[in-house]
């Protein structure tokens, strides 16, 4: 009976966090709008080999993540939930692997359930796991690969070992097809310390080639298909998207070595109080084979991405699966022996909630700021934000009432965030980062437009997805579409600022021409170097400028 209650509680938890509130949040540009539009175009065109964005070749990532996203929109429709369905599914599958692996290591159902709940409620996991990017997919394949390797190395028969390594190769191959060759480097780096300390080199060298073969066979069909269709894909993807992005001095998203320290601290909420103890307990217990495996799995990718020139918080998502297992194991021991860390965790959550309440007041219309984040007419959004932090502090306090038994309720600290964050986003943020909001405000003007031009790829993708059209033209800036725009068949998909007046004269009689521009809040629209317009509709950071036939 208790097991049934736990399962009902887990399903209710998943529904409240990962299902019910998802449709209430508009898509963010540039990431969510980009991936939403790529998958929409894949469904519309039926081309499941070559990824396109705005009808242009888009070679920044391989294909597998777009497949999953496309299936999500096919099943649930072109809506906010449909766009995010793929990443939610991947996150829940990763949580299922956390459950299975914890059971495999400790044979403790309660520990497995706690590890799963901790993983799903970690701030970084929830933030990325409900956000339509490719990182939850690669995190799933990496976690699946690490589980497969452990399964292979623990098998007692050659059939079991062979099956484990074949499965490892498949997961690595799918990882390559999701985000590239990092799916090969990360698992290798993660297992090497464990293999060295356990002296398991023999099994690795005897059976490792099976993983190589299955990985190659997994990638080969699509790899050959896209090489035939687009011969320069692999050259661009390898040199630009891997070498330049991560290793060279001009790498994207450059950040210092210590960049991931605050990411881990913030990402570990609402379980931050368990982080030091979990790592220290794991180190103390390093003679235990499974603990070494989890530690290596956590630390090695973190070091690898810290050394790399380019960094983003999403890169280390897979590190939090083993960390959740270590936290759950440590928390159960602490509850029995010394609950100090659990009390500290409760106080951290109280402090975080109270700080958020104060910060919300400071940036509210009633606070001391001359330019508040929310305007007076957005009072309900301020109260939503207060509710988010109040619930966080409340559940932090509740865990202290009988800490040995109530500490798992820290998983409910982000409940307000999950349910209310979509209702608390300030209009000034929505107007710049949520193209859906802009489209809703300007739908009647946008719909009949013969041509739509914009100076932002993220906004262009949002317009294309909302209006169900892929012919948006880039104006003045090419951004990440620069490579695709270099192809001869992309001629006419970019108009520079100097060419716009002549282009307008040539195309004006064909129908309504609409410019959607990103502007600064204090920027004077009249100072823009464009011909006089028939209609100007400013929505804070985005402005619609329209030219009608004459």
Swiss-Prot record:
This is Undecaprenyl phosphate-alpha-4-amino-4-deoxy-L-arabinose arabinosyl transferase. The lineage of its organism: Bacteria, Pseudomonadati, Pseudomonadota, Gammaproteobacteria, Enterobacterales. Its EC number is 2.4.2.43. It is found in: Cell inner membrane. Keywords: Cell inner membrane, Cell membrane, Glycosyltransferase, Lipid A biosynthesis, Lipid biosynthesis, Lipid metabolism, Lipopolysaccharide biosynthesis, Membrane, Transferase, Transmembrane, Transmembrane helix. One of its GO terms (molecular function) is mannosyltransferase activity. The keyword Transferase applies. Catalyzes the transfer of the L-Ara4N moiety of the glycolipid undecaprenyl phosphate-alpha-L-Ara4N to lipid A. The modified arabinose is attached to lipid A and is required for resistance to polymyxin and cationic antimicrobial peptides. It catalyses: 4-amino-4-deoxy-alpha-L-arabinopyranosyl di-trans,octa-cis-undecaprenyl phosphate + lipid IVA = lipid IIA + di-trans,octa-cis-undecaprenyl phosphate. The chain crosses the membrane at residues 7-27, 81-101, 111-133, 137-154, 165-185, 204-224, 263-283, 288-308, 315-335, 346-366, 382-402, 406-426. It is a multi-pass membrane protein. One of its GO terms (biological process) is response to iron(III) ion. InterPro entries: ArnT_tfrase, Glyco_trans_39/83, LipidA_mod_glycosyltrf_83. Pfam families: PMT. It is an enzyme of class 2 (transferase). GO terms for cellular component: plasma membrane. Belongs to the glycosyltransferase 83 family. Pathway: Lipopolysaccharide metabolism; 4-amino-4-deoxy-beta-L-arabinose-lipid A biosynthesis.
């Amino acid at each position: 009976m208790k097991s049934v209650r736990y399962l009902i509680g887990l399903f209710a938890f998943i529904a409240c966090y990962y299902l019910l509130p998802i449709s209430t949040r508009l898509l963010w540009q540039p990431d969510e709008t980009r991936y939403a539009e790529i998958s929409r175009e894949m469904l519309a065109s039926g081309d499941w080999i070559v990824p396109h964005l705005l009808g242009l070749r888009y070679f920044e990532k391989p294909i597998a993540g777009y497949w999953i996203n496309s299936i999500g929109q096919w099943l649930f429709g072109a809506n906010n939930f449909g766009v995010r369905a793929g990443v939610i599914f991947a996150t829940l599958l990763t949580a299922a692997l956390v459950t299975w692996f914890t059971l495999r290591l400790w044979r403790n159902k309660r520990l497995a359930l706690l590890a799963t709940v901790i993983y799903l409620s970690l701030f970084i996991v929830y933030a990325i796991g409900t956000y339509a990017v490719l990182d939850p997919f690669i995190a799933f394949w990496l976690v699946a690969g690490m589980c497969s390797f452990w399964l292979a190395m623990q098998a007692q028969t050659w059939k079991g070992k062979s099956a484990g390594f074949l499965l490892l190769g498949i997961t690595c191959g799918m990882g390559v097809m999701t985000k590239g060759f990092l799916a090969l480097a990360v698992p290798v780096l993660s297992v090497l310390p464990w293999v060295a300390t356990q002296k398991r080199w023999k099994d690795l060298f005897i059976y490792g080639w099976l993983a190589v073969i299955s990985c190659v066979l997994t990638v080969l069909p699509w790899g050959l298909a896209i090489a035939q269709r687009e011969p320069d894909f692999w050259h661009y993807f390898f040199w630009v998207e891997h070498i330049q992005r991560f290793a060279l001095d001009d790498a994207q998203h450059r950040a210092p070595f210590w960049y991931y320290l605050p990411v881990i601290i913030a990402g570990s909420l609402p379980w931050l109080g368990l982080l030091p103890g979990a790592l220290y307990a794991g180190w103390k217990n390093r003679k235990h084979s499974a603990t070494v495996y989890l530690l290596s799995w956590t630390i090695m990718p973190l070091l690898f991405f810290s050394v790399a020139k380019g960094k983003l918080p999403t890169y280390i998502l897979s590190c939090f699966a083993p960390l959740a297992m270590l936290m759950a194991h440590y928390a159960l021991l602490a509850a029995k022996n010394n609950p100090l860390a659990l009390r500290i965790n409760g106080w951290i959550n109280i402090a975080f909630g109270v700080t958020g309440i104060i910060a919300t007041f400071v940036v509210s219309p009633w606070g001391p700021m001359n330019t508040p984040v929310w305007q007076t007419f957005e009072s309900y959004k301020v109260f939503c934000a207060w509710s988010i932090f109040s619930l966080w502090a409340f559940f932090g306090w509740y865990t202290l009432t009988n800490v040995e038994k109530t500490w798992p309720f820290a998983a409910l600290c982000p409940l307000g965030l999950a349910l209310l964050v979509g209702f608390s986003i300030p209009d000034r943020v929505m107007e710049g980062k949520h193209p859906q909001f802009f489209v809703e405000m300007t739908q009647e003007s946008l719909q009949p437009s013969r041509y739509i031009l914009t100076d932002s790829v993220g906004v262009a993708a949002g317009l294309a997805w909302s209006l169900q059209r892929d012919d948006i033209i880039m104006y003045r800036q090419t951004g990440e579409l620069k490579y695709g725009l270099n192809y001869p068949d992309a001629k006419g998909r970019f108009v520079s600022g100097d060419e716009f007046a002549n282009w307008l004269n040539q195309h004006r009689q064909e129908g309504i021409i609409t410019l959607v521009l990103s502007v600064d809040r204090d920027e004077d629209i009249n100072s823009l170097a464009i011909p006089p317009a028939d209609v100007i509709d400013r929505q804070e950071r985005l402005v619609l400028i329209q030219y009608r036939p004459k």
